[in-house]
Amino acid sequence: QEYYEVGSNPLLGTKVYDAAVLWKENSYIPESLMCLSFQFQKHLSLGRGGMILTDDKFAAKDLRMMAHDGREPFVPWREQDIKCIGYHYYMTPETADLGIEKLPEAIKREPRQWVIEDWPDLTKMEIFR
């Protein structure tokens, strides 16, 4: 079986890394956008949600606005002139609390070793043919 090397290549020549299954200490790639997943099969299983890690404060501000419907925090929505697309993707406080509760055990537990066969072959899906 061929192992999937998480974070080995950015997506389509960008600085975006698919780190959805990554669970490794000190693995952040500087100057990148690393996308994590907390979907039910992932190491820190919260049922849904994720996060994007970055050390770029401008990207962090933009991503935060996009996660909150394109709105700026702490400004009443009626007073805003929305300048970017938004997705309503913020994590609920209840899910974040569950993550904090599950984190210590996830840190102790050995992560799953994903193999390439764990993903479907996109070339066989009608939409990609």
List PLM regions with ranges:
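Active-site region of PLP-dependent enzymes
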Residues: 23-25, 30-129
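Conserved PLP phosphate-binding loop immediately N-terminal to the Schiff-base lysine helix
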Residues: 1-37
